[in-house]
Amino acid sequence: MFADGKNQESTSESVNGWYAIYLWGLARGDARVRDLGRLMTSLEIRAAWSYWQMTNGESNFPAPFSNNKAVGIQWSTKVDYATWFGGNVEFIHCIQVPKQIQVQKVTLSMNPLQLSSDAPIHPDI
């Protein structure tokens, strides 16, 4: 356990995990599993929009996070503008992109590369 509690760095794994459960339920004809997967996928996507990808004027976090339009790692007690493997801008924004499947088109309502180029990056975060 870390001093700042549990953490999550990338939304792509959780979205894809729940989407896989939806597909599994669909393939097996199990409506309960399918519906659970669909619900949890939509909740994860909403969380990604609310807590990882920020649009102008919409943020759960103060500047400089809102200025950068992204959060790298969310902890139980804090947020970081970094990843486990580095603090490069492209790492922080593009960690949300890795597994490009159909559901990711919905999750990435904003282009992380465009957000990065629009954001006044603060390296001291």
Stretch-by-stretch model annotation:
Residues 23-30:
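Alpha-helix C-terminal capping/termination sites
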Residues 9-23:
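Well-ordered alpha-helical segments within folded domains of soluble proteins
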